[in-house]
Swiss-Prot record:
Residues 132-190, 294-343 form the PAS domain. This is Neuronal PAS domain-containing protein 4B. Residues 704-716 have a biased composition (Pro residues). It holds the Pfam family PAS_11. PANTHER family: HYPOXIA-INDUCIBLE FACTOR 1 ALPHA, NEURONAL PAS DOMAIN-CONTAINING PROTEIN 4. It is found in: Nucleus. GO terms for biological process: cell differentiation; excitatory postsynaptic potential; inhibitory postsynaptic potential; inhibitory synapse assembly; learning; long-term memory; positive regulation of DNA-templated transcription; positive regulation of transcription by RNA polymerase II. One of its GO terms (molecular function) is RNA polymerase II cis-regulatory region sequence-specific DNA binding. Residues 410-432, 444-479, 702-725, 757-784 are annotated as: Disordered.
C-alpha cells in the first residue's frame, strides 16, 4: 500500500513499542476512512479492513462489547432459577405465580429445613418416617392451628400448609419477597417475638405468648388485616456435629392457634377429637364450652374429662364461678362484667386457676367471646403451665398500659392491679399474696385476702344479670364498713400492707354536708386516683414556683363542687374512661371550675410528695389522698415566714433552757444513799387525792397572771435523806400520768415536788401534819411553775391549747386516711374558722 520511499523509519526498541506505533497509524487511517465513507453506504467495510490488523497485533479485545455477554449471563441465571422453581415442593398454581426473588426466598427456606432435619435425623439414628406424606398432610389439617419452624434470628424453615385455613393465604403469599417471620407479623409484636426467641441453655423449654399475624396478601401493607393467635414455642436441640450457624441460631418450633370465634366441635364416635394429656403434648390443649349470660355451663367438649376430670353431665347447669380459684374471682368477675357491658369488648381474655375433679388447681388461659343466641358466651379454655400463665398475664397487663398511653384512653376493663410490686409474680403452690393479685373495686377481694376484722362488702357492686349497680350505703352498709375498719387493733395496722387492701375499704366515710347525687354512676367512677400533687390556696405550688392566690369562699365552694363532680361522669360522654383518669383541676389546668379528663402513665413504684418538715397552723387544702378525699381546713401559708421561724427558734431554745433547769433541780435533790421505806395502800390513795386537788388548784390559777418567783423557805422535811424523793411507787406514777397528763410541762414539776413532799412525810411519820404540809407546799411551789423566761409562758399556753389536737392525732394511722405510697403532713389543728352558715368546716 505504501511505497518504500514514503515508509517512515521508526526505531522500535521492543515488540510492544511496535504495536503502539502501529496502533497510532491505524487510528490515523481509521479517521481518514471514516471521512471518506461518511457519505457511502459501505461503511461496514471499515470494520472488515481494520479487524485483521487488530487480530494480528492482539488489539481486538480493546474493542469488544460487553453488552451481549451480560445478557448471556443473565439468561443463564434465569435458567437456573427456573430449574430451582421446578424443585420446590409446592403446587403448580403457586409456581406459576412466583417471581425470581420469591423463588430464591422459598429455596432458602426449604434448604434450611432439609439441612437441619437431615442432620438431626442422622444424629439420633432415625430412619424412615412414622407417617406417610398424605397422612402427615391430613394430620396437619385436623390441628386447631398451624406449625411454624424458624431460627432465633427469625429465618423461616417451615410453615405448614394449613396456614391458609387460618390466615386466609398460603405460605407463598405470606412469605412474599422475604424468608423472615417478621414480614408476616404485625410490627407491634416484633418486640414480643424477639424476646421469646432469645437463645436459651436448656432445650425443650416451652414459652407461651400472644402474637398478631398479618392476613394481607401484600405483606408490606401491614395493618390491613391481622389475626391474633396464641403461640407456644419450644427450642429444639441442635443437630449432632452441627455447624456454627446452627449453634448460634437455635431452631424453634411454634404451634400457633388463632383466637377466633368458632363453635365448639363436640366429639362423636365417628369423629373423635385427639385429647392427649396436657403435660405430654406440645400442641395447645384446648376445650371449648358455651355459657349463658350468668356464666352457667350449657355445653362443653368431651375432652374436659381428660384435662379436668369432670363428666359433661356433672358440669351441665353448673356455675362457672364455682370452679374458679377464690384468689381469681375478682379478676374473672371484672372481665365478665366488661364483656357484658353495652358497647364494650366483644372478647376478653384472662388467666385463672380452676379446680379439677381431684381437687388440684389447673391454670387456664380463657378467651370469652360474646355472640348472639340463648347461650351467647363462647369460651376457649387453653390448659397451660404456671410459668406460661406468668408470661401471658404479664403480656396482657403490658398491652393494657400501652393502649392507655398510645390512644389516650384505657381499655374498658375494671381490673386495676393492687400494687406495682405484685405484678405477675408466679407462686409455687397454694394461696400467696404475690401470686396474680387482681383487685376489683366492684367485687372486692377474695375471702383468702380479707383484712382481719373487715368483712363488709365494697361500696358499690354490679349485678351482671340485672345490668345495674347496687349501692349498699343506702342500707347503712358504708357506715358499718367504716366502723368495722376503724375497730382494727393498732398492733395489726403496722403489719398490714395497704397495697393489698381494696380501695373501697380504706376510703373515708361519706361527707354529711354534701348533698348526695340522686343516682350513683358506674362503679368504675369510684376507683381511687393516683397519688396527687397538693394544691395550696395560699402557698406555692410544690413542683414549681408559681404562687397561688388565696381564693374566697365562692371560689373554694366552686372548686369543691368541681371535685365532687369529678366522681360523677354523666351518661352523655361519648366513651367511658378509667376512674384514675378523672382528676381534680390542678394549678396548670386550663380551667379552674370544671373537671379535666386525662390519661396518666402507669406508675410502677410509690410516688413520694416532698413536704418540708416544718410546723403548720393547718394542713394544706387540696392535699388529696389516693381516695381523692380533701383535708379538713384550708391552709393560709404552706411555707412559714421568716419572723415566724425566728419566733419558733426562740421558743425552742427557751424550752430547752427550761428543761435543763428542771433537770438540774432533779440532780441537786438526788439522795446519796437511803433505803426505800415501805409503802402503804392508804398512802397511795391519799397521794392520788392530793394530786387531784393540786391539779384542780393549778387549773384554777390563770397562768398569764402568775406572780414572779419569790424565795421559798426550805422545808424541814426536804433535807431528810429518802429514796422515795426520786422514785415513787408504780401506782403513784400511773395515777399521776393518768390524772394530770403527759403534755403539761407544769405537771412534771408538780409531780416532782409532790414526790419530794411525800417522801419526807413517810420518812418522818407525821400524819397529823399532812394537810398543813400540803397547803404550804402548794402555796410555795405554785409561783415556781413558770420560769423566769420572757416567752416561756406563751409557749406553755400554746402547748396546753394544742393538747386535744395531739391526743386526736394519736390514733390517726395511714390505714384510715391514706396509703403508704403517699406521705402526707400530720393532721394538726389550726385556728377555728366559721362560715356564713354557722358551721365550723365544710369539708367534714
Amino acid at each position: 500500500m505504501f511505497s518504500s520511499e514514503s515508509r517512515p523509519t521508526v526505531k522500535l526498541p521492543d515488540k510492544w513499542a511496535k504495536k503502539r506505533c502501529f496502533f497510532q497509524l491505524l487510528s490515523s487511517l481509521s479517521t481518514t476512512l471514516k471521512k471518506l465513507c461518511s457519505s457511502s453506504s459501505h461503511c461496514s467495510g471499515f470494520h472488515l479492513i481494520i479487524r485483521p490488523f487488530q487480530r494480528f497485533f492482539g488489539l481486538e479485545k480493546m474493542y469488544r462489547s460487553t453488552k451481549g455477554a451480560s445478557k448471556a449471563r443473565r439468561d443463564q441465571i434465569n435458567a437456573e432459577i427456573r430449574s430451582l422453581k421446578e424443585l420446590l415442593p409446592i403446587s403448580d398454581a403457586d409456581k406459576a405465580r412466583l417471581s425470581y426473588l420469591h423463588i430464591m426466598s422459598l429455596a432458602c427456606i426449604y434448604t434450611r429445613k432439609s439441612v437441619f432435619f437431615s442432620q438431626a435425623a442422622a444424629g439420633h439414628g432415625m430412619s424412615g418416617s412414622l407417617l406417610s406424606l398424605p397422612e402427615l398432610s391430613d394430620l396437619l389439617h385436623t390441628l386447631p392451628g398451624f406449625l411454624l419452624v424458624l431460627t432465633s434470628e427469625g429465618k423461616l424453615l417451615y410453615l405448614s400448609d394449613n396456614v391458609a385455613e387460618h390466615l386466609g393465604h398460603s405460605m407463598v403469599d405470606l412469605v412474599a419477597q422475604s424468608d423472615s417471620v417478621y414480614d408476616i407479623i404485625d410490627p407491634v409484636d416484633h418486640f414480643i417475638m424477639r424476646g421469646n426467641l432469645v437463645p436459651i441453655t436448656t432445650p425443650d423449654t416451652d414459652r407461651l405468648f400472644r402474637c398478631r399475624f398479618s392476613t394481607s396478601k401484600f405483606v408490606r401493607r401491614q395493618g390491613s388485616g391481622n389475626k391474633q393467635a396464641i403461640v407456644r414455642a419450644r427450642c429444639l436441640p441442635p443437630p449432632y456435629h452441627a455447624s456454627p450457624y446452627w449453634t448460634s441460631n437455635p431452631v424453634w418450633v411454634c404451634f400457633c392457634s388463632p383466637l377466633e370465634a368458632s363453635m365448639p366441635q363436640l366429639s362423636t364416635s365417628r369423629n373423635p377429637l385427639p385429647t392427649p394429656p396436657a403435660e405430654q403434648s406440645f400442641l395447645l390443649s384446648c376445650f371449648q364450652s358455651q355459657h349463658s349470660r350468668d356464666m352457667r355451663i350449657h355445653t362443653v367438649q368431651d375432652s374436659v374429662s381428660v384435662y379436668l376430670g369432670y363428666d359433661i353431665e356433672t358440669l351441665r347447669s353448673r356455675s362457672w364461678y364455682s370452679l374458679i380459684h377464690p384468689r381469681d374471682l375478682s379478676h374473672a368477675s371484672a372481665q365478665h362484667c366488661t364483656l357484658l357491658h353495652n358497647g364494650g369488648e366483644r372478647q376478653v381474655e384472662m388467666v385463672v386457676q380452676v379446680e379439677a375433679a381431684d381437687h388440684s388447681w389447673i391454670w387456664l388461659y380463657i378467651v370469652l367471646q360474646l355472640e348472639t343466641g340463648e347461650y351467647p358466651i363462647n369460651s376457649h379454655n387453653y390448659v397451660i403451665s404456671e410459668s406460661e400463665a406468668w408470661s401471658v398475664r404479664q403480656q396482657l397487663h403490658s398491652e393494657q398500659n400501652q393502649l392507655a398511653l398510645l390512644y389516650q384512653e384505657s381499655r374498658q376493663s375494671s381490673d386495676p392491679l393492687s400494687s406495682p410490686d405484685q405484678v405477675f409474680t408466679p407462686s409455687s403452690s397454694g394461696l400467696s399474696s404475690q401470686s396474680f393479685d387482681f383487685s376489683f373495686i366492684t367485687s372486692g377481694r377474695s375471702s383468702s385476702e380479707e383484712l382481719p376484722g373487715t368483712s363488709a362488702p365494697s361500696s358499690m357492686t354490679f349485678d351482671p344479670l340485672e345490668g345495674e349497680e347496687i349501692d349498699p350505703q343506702s342500707h347503712g352498709g358504708g357506715h358499718q364498713m367504716w366502723r368495722s375498719a376503724m375497730t382494727i387493733a393498732p398492733e395489726h395496722l403496722s403489719n398490714i400492707n395497704l397495697s393489698t387492701v381494696p380501695q373501697s375499704q380504706v376510703a373515708p366515710p361519706p361527707l354529711p354536708p354534701f348533698k348526695a347525687p340522686p343516682k350513683r354512676q358506674r362503679s368504675e367512677e369510684f376507683i381511687c386516683t393516683p397519688p396527687y400533687t397538693p394544691r395550696l390556696s395560699g402557698g406555692s405550688f410544690i413542683f414549681n414556683d408559681e404562687t397561688l392566690r388565696p381564693s374566697d369562699h365562692s371560689k373554694s365552694a366552686k372548686m369543691r363542687q368541681s371535685i365532687t363532680s369529678a366522681t360523677n361522669i354523666g351518661p352523655a360522654q361519648p366513651c367511658r374512661k378509667r376512674l384514675y383518669e378523672t382528676l381534680p383541676p390542678t394549678p396548670d389546668s386550663p380551667g379552674s371550675d370544671e373537671c379535666i379528663l386525662m390519661a396518666l402513665p402507669e406508675i410502677r413504684g410509690p410516688l413520694y410528695v416532698d413536704v418540708p418538715h416544718l410546723p403548720f397552723h393547718a394542713p394544706p387544702e387540696g392535699l388529696l389522698t389516693p381516695e381523692a378525699s380533701p383535708t379538713k381546713k384550708p391552709c393560709l401559708s404552706f411555707f412559714p415566714r421568716e419572723d415566724e421561724t425566728e419566733r419558733e427558734r426562740m421558743e425552742i431554745s427557751l424550752l430547752a433552757q427550761y428543761i435543763s433547769t428542771l433537770a438540774e433541780g432533779f440532780c441537786h435533790n438526788h439522795p446519796q444513799g437511803a433505803s426505800a421505806p415501805p409503802h402503804h395502800a392508804n398512802s397511795s390513795l391519799a397521794h392520788i387525792d392530793v394530786l387531784m386537788f393540786e391539779e384542780k388548784a393549778v387549773d384554777d390559777i390563770p397562768l398569764p397572771n402568775l406572780p414572779s418567783p419569790s424565795p421559798v423557805p426550805p422545808s424541814p422535811y426536804s433535807s431528810v435523806p429518802s429514796y422515795s424523793q426520786c422514785r415513787s411507787s408504780p401506782v403513784q406514777e400511773e395515777a399521776a400520768v393518768t390524772l394530770i397528763g403527759v403534755n403539761h410541762l407544769c405537771s412534771v414539776q408538780l409531780t416532782h415536788c409532790n414526790r419530794m413532799t411525800e417522801g419526807g412525810l413517810q420518812d418522818g411519820e407525821r400524819p397529823d401534819e399532812d394537810m398543813e404540809m400540803m397547803s404550804s407546799q402548794r402555796s410555795s411551789e405554785a409561783p415556781a411553775l413558770t420560769p423566769a423566761l420572757p416567752c416561756a409562758q406563751s409557749l406553755l399556753e400554746e402547748l396546753v391549747t394544742m393538747e386535744p389536737v395531739f391526743g386526736a392525732a394519736v390514733p390517726m394511722t395511714p390505714a384510715d386516711r391514706q396509703q403508704d405510697e403517699l406521705y402526707q403532713l400530720p393532721h394538726q389543728g389550726g385556728p377555728q374558722m366559721f362560715y356564713q352558715d354557722g358551721t365550723g368546716d365544710h369539708m367534714f
